[in-house]
């Protein structure tokens, strides 16, 4: 599976053979759903909290005697049937994280990359070692890759000045290769990988 290598001006400077074990898989939406749900669950803060009957301030005295009032018996004014009362079985702070098999996570990553290749929305860049000192310069660079609504740039390493130049651009995100994930790939219209990133991903994922 051969694709062109382009430079920062979107000019073809060579070609590279992509490993079909990583970039040539059939779409598996079931796997993508599993991985995305797993990522979203890990992102949840889990800080939701409702006050139980032991958390609410107020008297603990019995509001009135048990019998001979003609009213329903009550033991506390903090019970859930009263205004300002407790919430029964309400949410408590907890982690929503759960485990997902590594094989499924890696398969999801390969399927997401393969879908971008099949849709012709994956660009292989020769290098990101360029001089970009201003946001205007970075905007001009991404103008060379027009036709996409958003861009995810993945590189083994990136200059700090390039990160600063790109971080204020809407629809452009930079990631290190170690942080590439299914959710970010699917959220962005175009994925730009450097040659080093492609080789690194193939080394990590081709033996699965």
From Swiss-Prot:
The gene is rplD. Belongs to the universal ribosomal protein uL4 family. One of its GO terms (cellular component) is ribosome. Keywords: Ribonucleoprotein, Ribosomal protein, RNA-binding, rRNA-binding. HAMAP family: Ribosomal_uL4_B. Pfam families: Ribosomal_L4. It comes from the Bacteria. One of the primary rRNA binding proteins, this protein initially binds near the 5'-end of the 23S rRNA. It is important during the early stages of 50S assembly. It makes multiple contacts with different domains of the 23S rRNA in the assembled 50S subunit and ribosome. Forms part of the polypeptide exit tunnel. Gene3D superfamilies: 3.40.1370.10. GO terms for molecular function: rRNA binding; structural constituent of ribosome. Residues 49-78 are annotated as: Disordered. This is Large ribosomal subunit protein uL4. GO terms for biological process: translation. Part of the 50S ribosomal subunit. It comes from Anaplasma phagocytophilum (strain HZ).
């Amino acid at each position: 599976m051969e694709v062109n290598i382009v430079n920062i001006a979107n000019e073809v400077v060579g070609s590279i053979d992509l490993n079909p074990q990583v970039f040539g898989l059939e779409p598996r939406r079931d796997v993508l759903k599993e991985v995305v749900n797993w990522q979203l669950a890990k992102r949840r803060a889990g800080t939701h909290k409702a006050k139980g009957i032991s958390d609410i301030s107020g008297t603990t005295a019995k509001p009135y005697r048990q019998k001979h009032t003609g009213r329903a018996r009550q033991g506390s004014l903090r019970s859930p049937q009263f205004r300002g009362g407790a919430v029964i079985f309400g949410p408590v702070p907890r982690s929503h994280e759960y485990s997902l098999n590594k094989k499924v996570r890696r398969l999801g990553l390969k399927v997401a990359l393969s879908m971008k290749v099949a849709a012709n929305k994956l660009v292989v860049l020769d290098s990101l070692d360029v001089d970009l000192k201003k946001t205007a310069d970075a905007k001009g660079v991404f103008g060379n890759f027009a036709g996409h609504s958003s861009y995810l740039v993945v590189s083994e390493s990136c200059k700090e000045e390039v990160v600063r130049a790109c971080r204020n651009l809407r629809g452009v995100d930079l990631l290190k290769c170690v942080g590439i994930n299914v959710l970010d790939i699917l959220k962005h219209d175009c994925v730009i990988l450097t040659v080093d990133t492609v080789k690194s991903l193939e080394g990590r994922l081709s033996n699965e």
